[in-house]
């Protein structure tokens, strides 16, 4: 614990050179020190921090300032119209005691169940802001390994409108760093997120609308950004898609899976997603579009532009069959059980140290992909494009070198540029 605090504090010092306090007295400002917080890294400050947040909420909102120090804390709940502002040298450190994270209802892996409340949470609270600079450290590994009930996440916002996360860093989180559920008009900007191990997602966007993620540096043990909308019949009936998502000017990396994952929890659907002006690298895929038999839902209107893809076995992975594994909670109906994918396009992409441009053979013939366009793809790769069961495919200006075998390999695919000659 002490070593993690020292490492994290040193990182924050290097990232933010300013030493000016964010806690100068002003109307509507609530200093956690005034409510008894010690910030010594030893005393549990949970009660004092929550008391400050409650006082701010009772006043109708304001600014809760966290001055320099290391604040050891359990779960905290932020109210409406509250801005939590961290000093550049303020560190929030998750408690190692599971009793400091009460059991609540959560959606985890697409299903509603019991889980431990996140280190920082807000529910049904509009106009919540968390502002850096400053750093938030997740609970220890032992808590993050909890699966049933789910261990504590770092930040979880549920049914929140107009939430903003800006300018802070997170460290050593073993589960999802940020989970957004049923949120609208959300912005994440200038965040630096780091996590370890599988399940250490960066930002999970779950049945949310109008989301912007910009100028973030996310390097995780699992998916850097994951787009979800629940799974099974309950999520399909609920019908709350993730939609209108913009990801721009970000650096996204995953040491285990994908820089950007779409699915497999997508029974509510995912649509209108833009990713632009980003650099991506993934241990398995830079971008992974995934589902399985029985999951249902849809992926539609997903576009990518001006992307740099580095050190990834695959630029785009498409897998809707999951090695034949059927969903344990299938959406009923032969037509409805297959995920629909339509109107997906990528333009002006630079690939480097990428094994394969597209791995897209795991698609059901019962629900072919409808509309996939790749334009202006340059760089080097070992293999080209593999597609199965797709229509209205357009390949234009794919000027890659270094590959072996055919540039384009297809099975039951209709479209333009499929012979591998017109595209170069």
Tell where the protein language model's regions lie, with residue ranges:
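Bacterial N-terminal signal peptides
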Residues: 8-18
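Short amphipathic alpha-helical "recognition" segments used for binding
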Residues: 6-7, 54
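Extracellular/periplasmic carbohydrate-active domains that bind, remodel
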Residues: 14, 23-424
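Positively charged n-region of N-terminal signal peptides that target proteins for export
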Residues: 1-4
């Amino acid at each position: 614990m002490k070593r993690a605090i020292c490492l994290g504090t040193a990182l924050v010092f290097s990232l933010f050179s300013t030493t000016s306090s964010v806690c100068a007295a002003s109307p509507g400002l609530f200093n956690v020190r005034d409510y008894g917080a010690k910030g010594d890294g030893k005393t549990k400050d949970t009660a004092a921090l929550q008391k400050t947040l409650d006082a701010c909420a009772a006043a109708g909102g304001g600014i809760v300032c966290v001055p320099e120090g290391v604040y050891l804390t359990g779960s905290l709940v932020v109210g409406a119209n509250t801005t939590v502002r961290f000093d550049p040298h303020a560190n929030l450190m998750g408690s190692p005691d599971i009793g400091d994270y009460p059991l609540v209802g959560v959606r985890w892996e697409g299903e509603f169940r019991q889980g431990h409340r996140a280190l920082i949470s807000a529910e049904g609270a509009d106009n919540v802001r968390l502002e850096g600079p400053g750093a938030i450290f997740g609970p220890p590994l032992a808590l993050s390994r909890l699966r049933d009930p789910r261990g504590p996440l770092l930040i979880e916002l549920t049914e929140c409108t107009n939430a903003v996360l800006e300018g802070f860093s997170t460290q050593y989180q073993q589960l999802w760093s940020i989970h957004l559920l049923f949120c609208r008009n959300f912005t994440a900007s200038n965040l630096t997120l780091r996590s370890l191990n599988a399940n250490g997602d960066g930002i999970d966007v779950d049945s949310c609308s109008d989301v912007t993620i910009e100028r973030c540096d996310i390097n995780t043990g699992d998916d850097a950004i994951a787009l979800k909308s629940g799974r099974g019949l309950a999520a399909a009936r609920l019908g709350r898609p993730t939609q209108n998502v913009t990801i721009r000017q970000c650096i996204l990396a995953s040491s285990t899976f994908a820089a950007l994952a779409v699915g497999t929890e997508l029974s509510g659907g995912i649509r209108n997603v833009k990713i632009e002006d980003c650099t991506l690298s993934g241990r398995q895929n830079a971008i992974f579009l995934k589902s399985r038999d029985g999951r249902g839902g849809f992926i539609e209107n997903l576009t990518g532009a001006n992307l740099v893809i580095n050190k990834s076995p695959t630029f785009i992975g498409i897998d809707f069959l999951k090695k034949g594994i059927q969903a344990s909670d299938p959406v009923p109906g032969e037509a409805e059980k297959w995920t629909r994918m339509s109107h997906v396009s990528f333009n002006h992409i630079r690939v480097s140290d990428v094994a394969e441009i597209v791995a897209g053979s795991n698609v059901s013939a019962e629900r072919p992909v409808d509309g996939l366009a790749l334009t202006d793809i340059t760089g080097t790769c070992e293999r080209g494009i593999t597609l199965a069961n797709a229509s209205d495919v357009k390949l234009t200006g794919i000027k890659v070198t270094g590959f072996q075998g055919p540039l384009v390999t297809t099975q039951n695919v209709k479209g333009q540029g499929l012979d591998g000659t017109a595209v170069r």
